[in-house]
Curated annotation (Swiss-Prot):
Functional note: Carrier protein involved in proton-driven auxin influx. May mediate the formation of auxin gradient from developing leaves (site of auxin biosynthesis) to tips.
Molecular function per GO: amino acid transmembrane transporter activity; symporter activity
Chief place where the protein resides: membrane
Superkingdom classification of source: Eukaryota
Membrane topology (Extracellular): 85-86, 165-179, 225-241, 297-323, 387, 455-480
Cytoplasmic side of membrane: 1-66, 108-143, 201-203, 263-275, 345-365, 409-433
Localisation: Cell membrane
Native species: Oryza sativa subsp. japonica (Rice)
Membrane topology: Multi-pass membrane protein
Transmembrane regions: 67-84, 87-107, 144-164, 180-200, 204-224, 242-262, 276-296, 324-344, 366-386, 388-408, 434-454
Pfam families attached to this UniProt entry: Aa_trans
InterPro entries, per database record: AA_transpt_TM (IPR013057)
Name by which UniProt lists this protein: Putative auxin transporter-like protein 4
Keywords (A to Z) from UniProt: Amino-acid transport, Auxin signaling pathway, Cell membrane, Membrane, Symport, Transmembrane, Transmembrane helix, Transport
């Protein structure tokens, strides 16, 4: 049974771990001692590096997926916002993102409980956000969730690919950024071989360590470098409203990484333990993003307005090269996080999601990478593209739709009475929850989508007018 479990993981079948773990333990007692020992050894190695599903795995996945390349663009956002607004928006959107991630987790548990009461078996099926919406609210909600979620994850993958090319250029500028995009597109395509979020255990752990190093490198390097001439941090939006709301929307994007919440929960052995995980992950992420962005802005001030990648302003040293390499590896991992749900959707569309072998599924997934590759070459605007995606996609995908879906699901009195996860009294019960949801919808609709969409569009069009589509080397210094 244990060896079958290992094969199941490799093939990408998503079996309930608690039931299977119990069966494995029971069978191991009655098997031959030598065979049982070998199986246990294989299973131990697989579990250590390959097969995660604990609360800690979920925490590492959430934190690792949330921070990634945005660490390098947040100083740019601070230069657009000013120090006080930059700090305030990070804390505010961090809390708001944690709230909507909690709502998504509640809806997942509600959907899964209802379906399992109807004897639906999810052993060979990964539940996704659009299916939760479909099961709870119907096909119109499903279509909206599918459209926004897939489009966001598509561009989220594009952003990781753009970031890879932008970063590697700072340690090897013999090739332009567009050529590096081609190269890293081929490298990132290897994520088709990772079956599910179960299998990111060691990668999410290493990814977070790598980004932690990069964050503290930025902080220390900025302080050691000291203030440049003319670096006078502003306290508010003293430039233009376009810059201000573009920066705010980039932070909205930063804390909107919970579009993969359902897939992470489904990979857990006990998904109901997820409720506070995203908040805990956000708390750690803030210890990385706040010091690094504040220190960089303190040191370089308005110079960041023309350098959306923080690496561009720091002198080349072995410490910076190490940070670049580690960030590249983490961006490869984050590309997999963003792309894996798209792989699942595509597998379901062409009918290979259930029981196909790992090689067949990998081959079937390859077409998903091609449009990502193409879009990264068309729009290589590292930094401005984050705000555009944040305003038009993140606003709806992980803020507005979850809040509205939660209210619609539990609007009937019977649904509230029979809720699997009723809101805690500390949050005001149902009235407090509904009030918080209404605030999220109104705020994000007006500030994130409205003002943020306007500002991000203006800024994005400026980048196109200045650099053009398919530009070979976005924001590269002139060669002498």
């Amino acid at each position: 049974m244990a060896s079958e479990k290992v094969e199941t993981i490799v093939a990408g079948n998503y079996v309930e771990m608690e039931r299977e773990g119990a069966a494995t333990a029971g069978e191991g007692v009655g098997g031959a001692a030598a065979a049982s020992g070998r199986r246990r050894g294989k299973l131990a190695v697989s579990s250590l590096f390959w097969h995660g599903g604990s609360v800690y795995d979920a925490w590492f996945s959430c934190a690792s997926n949330q921070v990634a390349q945005v660490l390098l663009t947040l100083p740019y956002s601070f230069s657009q916002l000013g120090m006080a607004s930059g700090v305030a928006f990070q804390v505010f959107y961090g809390l708001m993102g944690s709230w909507t991630a909690y709502l998504i987790s509640v809806l997942y548990v509600e959907y899964r409980t209802r379906r399992e009461r109807d004897k639906v078996d999810f052993r060979n099926h990964v539940i996704q956000w659009f299916e939760v919406l479909d099961g709870l609210l119907g096909r119109h909600w499903r279509n909206a969730g599918l459209l926004f979620n897939c489009t966001f994850l598509l561009f989220g993958s594009v952003i990781q690919l753009i970031a890879c090319a932008s970063n590697i250029y700072y340690i090897n500028d013999r090739l332009d950024k567009r050529t590096w995009t081609y190269i890293f597109g081929a490298c990132c395509a290897t994520t088709v071989f990772v079956p599910s979020f179960h299998n990111y255990r060691v990668w999410s752990f290493l990814g977070l360590l790598m980004t932690s190093y990069t964050a503290w490198y930025l902080t220390v390097a900025a302080v050691v470098h000291g203030k440049v001439d003319g670096a006078a941090p502003r306290a508010g939006p003293s430039k233009t409203m376009v810059l201000y709301f573009t920066g705010a929307t980039n932070i909205l994007y930063t804390f909107g990484g919970h579009a993969v919440t359902v897939e992470i929960m489904h990979a857990m052995w006990r998904p109901r333990r997820f409720k506070m995980i995203y908040l805990a992950a956000t708390a750690y992420v803030l210890t990385l993003t706040l010091p690094s962005a504040a220190a960089m802005y303190w040191a370089f001030g308005d110079a960041l307005l023309d350098h959306s990648n923080a690496f561009a302003l720091l002198p080349r040293t072995p410490w910076r090269d190490a940070a670049v390499v580690l960030m590249l590896i983490h961006q490869f991992i984050t590309f997999g996080f963003a792309c894996t749900p798209l792989y699942f959707v595509w597998e379901k569309a062409i009918g290979v999601h259930g029981g196909a072998g790992v090689l067949r599924r990998a081959a079937a997934r390859l077409p998903v990478v091609l449009p990502i590759w193409f879009l990264a070459v068309i729009f290589p605007f590292f930094g401005p593209i984050n705000s555009t995606v944040g305003s038009f996609l993140v606003s709806f995908t992980v803020y507005i739709i979850p809040a509205m879906a939660h209210m619609a699901t539990f609007a009937p009195a019977a649904a509230r009475e029979n809720a699997v996860e009723p809101p805690p009294r500390a949050l005001g019960g149902w009235p407090g929850t509904f009030a918080a949801n209404c605030f999220v919808v109104a705020w994000v609709l007006v500030v994130g989508f409205g003002f943020g969409g306007w500002a991000s569009t203006v800024n994005f069009v400026r980048q196109v007018d200045t650099f053009g589509l398919f530009t070979k080397c976005y924001q590269c210094p002139p060669r002498h």
